Amino acid sequence: MTLDLQTTIENAWENRTNLSPVDATAEVREAVEQTIAALDLGRLRVAEKTEAGWIVHQWIKKAVLLSFRLQDNAIMGQAPMQFYDKVPLKFAEYGDTAFQHGGYRVVPPAVARRGAFIARNVVLMPSYVNIGAYVDEGTMVDTWATVGSCAQIGKNVHLSGGVGIGGVLEPLQANPTIIEDNCFIGARSEVVEGVVVEENSVLAMGVFLSQSTKIYDRATGKVTYGRVPSGSVVVPGSLPSEDGSHSLVCAVIVKRVDAQTRAKTSINDLLRA
């Protein structure tokens, strides 16, 4: 079934400029709908971690993009909280039974779009989770945090207030941004452009990471890009230019996570009971 969906999506993608709510075939509509529904339930995800590393299923991302060509805008919600959009809200039709089955908390006015997966014991404070995102068990998405389209958030992650996790839809990115298990992302930090923060890492308040951000390891003196090694403690910093005329923003790995760091950033099970 997945192979059939993929083939239909790939073929539709090649013809995407000709797609519209009027012109799309029933086969394409059904393939896109099934893919979005599977994303919503966590049966499919845009990226998966394997022994060889992260694998990105580009065809699923294409299905998300195609969904915008197949839907007309419609009014959703009720005054004074009315919206006009193509993507339904994830919880629009939920009743008490559906929320209990989901096993997560949604604090008003948190918003998740249909096609985002929210796992058990997740807490959504007043935040935003975009289509295609995957938020795994025990994670806290704190107030005014944003989980971008197709972003992958691991288990027991804390996204602090105002954190931004970048999406892939605009500007169009090849790979999703990934925050692995047991990470703590400090307030107002931004991780975008497909950067991977490996498991058990801690980003201090105000760390900004894109593919062009230098990541400086204080212990080794090495500079890398696009990936924070597992167990890193990262703070904002700057590095001087070669001629010493100016400095540019960077992220600095100051140490590896230790017991003291864990004590300061551990999650509170009482909030997930």
Curated annotation (Swiss-Prot):
Location(s) in or outside the cell: Cytoplasm
Enzyme class: transferase
EC number: 2.3.1.117
GO biological process, one term: diaminopimelate biosynthetic process
Pathway where this protein functions: Amino-acid biosynthesis; L-lysine biosynthesis via DAP pathway; LL-2,6-diaminopimelate from (S)-tetrahydrodipicolinate (succinylase route): step 1/3
A molecular function (GO) term: 2,3,4,5-tetrahydropyridine-2,6-dicarboxylate N-succinyltransferase activity
Classification via PROSITE patterns: HEXAPEP_TRANSFERASES
Catalysed reaction, written as an equation: (S)-2,3,4,5-tetrahydrodipicolinate + succinyl-CoA + H2O = (S)-2-succinylamino-6-oxoheptanedioate + CoA
Cellular-component GO terms for this entry: cytoplasm
Gene3D superfamilies in alphabetical order: Hexapeptide repeat proteins (2.160.10.10), Tetrahydrodipicolinate-N-succinyltransferase, N-terminal domain (1.10.166.10)
Major location category of this protein: cytoplasm
Transmembrane segments: none
Superkingdom of the source species: Bacteria
InterPro entries cross-referenced by the UniProt entry: DapD_Trfase_Hexpep_rpt_fam (IPR005664), Hexapep (IPR001451), Hexapep_transf_CS (IPR018357), THP_succinylTrfase_dom1 (IPR023180), THP_succinylTrfase_N_sf (IPR037133), Trimer_LpxA-like_sf (IPR011004)
Keywords associated with the record: Acyltransferase, Amino-acid biosynthesis, Cytoplasm, Diaminopimelate biosynthesis, Lysine biosynthesis, Repeat, Transferase
Pfam families named in the record: Hexapep_2, THDPS_N_2
Protein family: Belongs to the transferase hexapeptide repeat family.
HAMAP family xref list: DapD
Protein name: 2,3,4,5-tetrahydropyridine-2,6-dicarboxylate N-succinyltransferase
Organism of origin: Bordetella petrii (strain ATCC BAA-461 / DSM 12804 / CCUG 43448)
Organism lineage: Bacteria, Pseudomonadati, Pseudomonadota, Betaproteobacteria, Burkholderiales
Gene responsible for this protein: dapD
